[in-house]
Amino acid sequence: MELNAYIGRAGTGKSHHMIDNIKQQMKEDPLGDPIVLIAPTQSTFQLEQAFVNDKELNGSLRTEVLHFERLSYRVFQEVGGLTEERLTQAATEMMIYDLVQQHKSELKLYQSQVNYYGFSEKLSEQIQDFKKYSVTPEHLHTFLQDNDLKTRTRHKLEDISLIYQYFEERINGEFITSEDSLNHFIDILSQSEWIKRAEVYIDGFHNFSTLEYQIIKALVQSAKKVTVLLTTDGNEDPFSLFRKPSEVLTHLKEIAKDLNIELQQQFFKQQYRFNNKDLIQLEQQFDALQINPIAYDGSINILESSSIREEVNEVARQIIKDTRDKQYRYQDIAILYRDEAYAYLFDSVLPQYDIPFNIDTKRSMTHHPIMEMVRSLLEVIQTNWNISPMMRLIKTNILTNHFKDSAYLIDLLENFVVERGVYGKRWLDEKLFSIDNFTKMGRKEHKLTTEEREDFEQVVHLKNDIIDKILTFEKAMNEAENVRGFATAFYETMEAFDLPKYLMTHRDQLDVDGRHEEAEEIDQIWNGLIQILDDLVTVFDNEEMTLKRFLEVFDIGLEQLEFVMIPQTLDQVSIGTMDLAKVDNKKHIYMVGMNDGAMPQPVSSSSLITDEEKKVFEQQAQVELSPTSDILQMDEAFVCYIAMTRGSEQVTFSYSLMGAQGEDKEKSPFIDQIQGLFNGLEVMNIHYQHNAQPLSLMEHPHQTKVVLFESLKAWLEAEMVADVWVDAYQVMRDNDKLNNGLEYLLTALTYDNETVKLDEPLAASLYGSTINASVSRFEGYNDCPFKHYANHGLRLNERTKYKLENFDLGNIFHTALKYISDKVDGDFKNLDNKKIHALTVEALENVLPQVQFNLMDSNAYYRYVSKRIGVIVESTLKALRYQNKNTKFKPQRFEAGFRKTPNNSEELIAQPLITKQGIPVNIRGQIDRIDAYTKDDKSYINIIDYKSSNPSAKLDLKKVYYGKQMQMMTYMDIALQNAQRLGLSNEIKPGGLLYFHVHDERLSFKDWGELEDDALTQDKLEQAFLKEYKLRGLVNSDMDVVDALDIRLEEIGKSDIVPVSLKKDGSIGSRGSSVADETTIHKFIKHNKDNFIKTATNIMEGHTEVAPLKFDDQLPCQFCNFQSVCHVDTIIDSKHYRHVEETIDPIKAIQDVELESGDHNE
């Protein structure tokens, strides 16, 4: 029985001395007594290499490198005694989740949290933590009985104790956790003859749990000799740099005292690792109270960057220099980080420099396509075939890979199901997926071509194939009665899908292609799936469980799967976190992300039990738990110390001034501390260094091209650029090995967001020999020519989603009002409220099922919206009733369509316009309502347009003038041309161009006290209500028209129906009036026609410019669907914005328009 401790600071040769001793013994007696070297899991491979690579040894049968758990396996193999089934981490988590769900009604604090994502994982971690520190449910029960605690703390511990107790009962005699197996290992250790003959070394640890101390004590009692290596100066001050390993030293002394032996301490003080004064000074003086600075000799660097990407790029350049100038191998270099944002950048940046590397982290399997397929398949069943998991399942393309062009077919299928809102068993509706239903994809219905029909037939075939598989899976799972049945059904279904065969074939192909890591991932995923199924059967076997619970438990298990990737080559840069830092004796260590907040890092408790609760428990129960946050915070300097002392020749610290999210960052306080150790150690700002020495950026061809592009772009913009970049360009251009991709970069240099003007034949082939278009198409062109080109030239169509859009709402109102108007023949004035309600219900029953494939009945929200629509329609009818009673104008036509050649007698004729190229322009559309009033053989026409949005329900004459608002003038022009079809006299004149805002009225009053009187209240409410529906637009100033629009106008002075008010003398007032004389209206109509011709001419000339019209400080880009196509940029493209004179008075400006005889209907 002997306990030794090797004590020394970093780099003093403790491990080297141990390895030399072991090697010497192995050489002297290769088959002698066993030597056991215990190390952390992540260090075992490195230590094994030390023996394997020794040419005199070439391995050994005598020495074994193990971690604590593997050591227990080794002893159990010899002694036996472990009859229970060992639980994996995933099995433990699944069991605890199931227990929590079973007993959630017994919980006091956590009852409402048991379904939260990650709760069972946290609870599992807490129970494992208790086991590591030998805290049993009995400890918790006794503590709760003996102490007066806060209610929340008591309920929390009672809940944890309850599940812990159930867990212990569940596994008792049948299963065993890794912590329990170690406890059993302690009990039988004395029976091991192998251990009795062994010398045991423990290296690489800085602290131990209570359970591990118990193992060490048992080893001391049983083995010939136990030696523990500690990185400490032997100072047991709890506030020193070496607090953590010194605490271990204290525990070892207590173990020795308990066993009545002496702890033999061997001190190591001579530095062996560091090859220069800088690193020796860094190690020895880092924790010194009084610093003795020395002259800096260049072995330590501190880099400052503006961003973490710039920082990682510079580290990559430095690594290239290390391998080129210092003849380092990649395996001589390590990068240590703390901030997880760096891990992503290593993956993206280092391959650009052709630097091989291995990041020592375990990645979750969750987001791999295979795992996504499995989890989505489970979620499809859980959510009753919800569209989201269904599409995730299909888009993995694993179950559909046997289809030709499957990715394209899946995109088509997604467009269809998203537009139709396919969910639940609607996936099985063959009528819904009939080929004819594919004629409407997006907003435009069209006849299918032969090619399209064949594509959609393949889409339906693919859909049916995946549905058959899901039904097979669902049927098999529903027929299962217990967990073993579920697991068997899942596996057999995967076999039926040929998934194993597909995965193995795909893996072999990846190997052939040299993508060995991806191939290894497939192997690990399949093995992981099988392991989880085995765990389910092991833990639950024939236990009855609902399908819902099984799927939840299965998913919990899948969440635990992680990739454990073996390095693909030995010569590669090692990357790890500073906390683990298992990269001893590297020639160059890069410590990146040395920012305040990362090093030191604020430590906060993430366990269920808070730090304060831990302290109370430790004091009252006389047990030790895992360190609290304040203790861990004290160890931050030690973490930095261990990380920076891994290098033997050079250490580079780097930090950035800006984080991954653009936030400001400060350098670590340790940077100043390190600078203070040396005279002459300066921080090198990477940006300034590169400006001063541009050649320092030219370490790798790929990155040199990137920086070359940036420099040449700056040069083109007349900025100062070093001449060396022009030389670099010439060299790369003339070198066939370096100029690959250079031409592509140069085209980007002169990139300007300019489109190519189409030649007229090409424009004609796109748009046709005749333009048949709606008014909105021309308005769209005047907003931006490219918008028109993308929409009507390229015919790009945004995916339509199964939801209510603004234009859907507008269509509902239009259709419902037309239905009711036709029913009452436009006579609203005699409708009472009861009749209005009945008509509204009848209209919506006819209209709503036609909206977006019965969207309005798809869920409770849309059914509520339907009711609100009914309220709005009723309010609108009440307003129309009021307006109808007080005007001489009567509705003449509702939803009046117009085109060049009418389809029936109800439609109006639109006379073609002719472009400058002689191309006919046929305008088509639909006028919501035409009202007419006849007096003295003269008929006056009102155009009424229903708008469901407030901004669009305004007539802006400036927009009319510039062609941004062409609708109303066009409608009036069409109506004036169709007197006969409207059944009016030959002399027809414009009355009003008016918008009716269909909306849900919201009333507000400044002084609600005014509404105390009931009669007054009703009157005021009615007035306010009617004011909300006042027509807006432009009215003919002819008094015959004005008087007819509101028959009470002379009496009330200001109309609450139309935008007209009268002065006391009976003339039209300027305030509250929007009027123009008949000639002016005709000039606007003529100008509007000219805008049509001008616009159509530009279209046929092939204009496609990205040139949005900026009007009223707003761009049409704000609501444009084609920004991802045109790539409009507010900085680059601002010079292309079109502007118009917005200060004009449109009434005055329009007077310059000359009317021809045919333009005035007199």
Curated annotation (Swiss-Prot):
Cofactor note: Binds 1 [4Fe-4S] cluster.
Cofactor: Mg(2+); [4Fe-4S] cluster
Keyword Transport: no
GO BP of this protein: double-strand break repair via homologous recombination
Annotated Gene3D superfamilies: 3.90.320.10, 6.10.140.1030, P-loop containing nucleotide triphosphate hydrolases
Residues that hold [4Fe-4S] cluster according to the record: C784, C1117, C1120, C1126
EC number of this enzyme: 3.1.-.-
Domain UvrD-like helicase C-terminal: 269-583
Binding site for ATP: G8, R9, A10, G11, T12, G13, K14, S15
GO molecular function annotations of the record: 4 iron, 4 sulfur cluster binding; 5'-3' exonuclease activity; ATP binding; double-stranded DNA binding; helicase activity; metal ion binding
Keywords: 4Fe-4S, ATP-binding, DNA damage, DNA repair, DNA-binding, Exonuclease, Helicase, Hydrolase, Iron, Iron-sulfur, Metal-binding, Nuclease, Nucleotide-binding
Location of the UvrD-like helicase ATP-binding domain: 1-275
Subunit structure comment from the entry: Heterodimer of AddA and AddB.
Known function: The heterodimer acts as both an ATP-dependent DNA helicase and an ATP-dependent, dual-direction single-stranded exonuclease. Recognizes the chi site generating a DNA molecule suitable for the initiation of homologous recombination. The AddB subunit has 5' -> 3' nuclease activity but not helicase activity.
Additional note from the record: Despite having conserved helicase domains, this subunit does not have helicase activity.
PANTHER family for this protein: RECBCD ENZYME SUBUNIT RECC
Family per record: Belongs to the helicase family. AddB/RexB type 1 subfamily.
Protein name: ATP-dependent helicase/deoxyribonuclease subunit B
The organism of origin for this protein: Staphylococcus haemolyticus (strain JCSC1435)
Classification of source organism: Bacteria, Bacillati, Bacillota, Bacilli, Bacillales
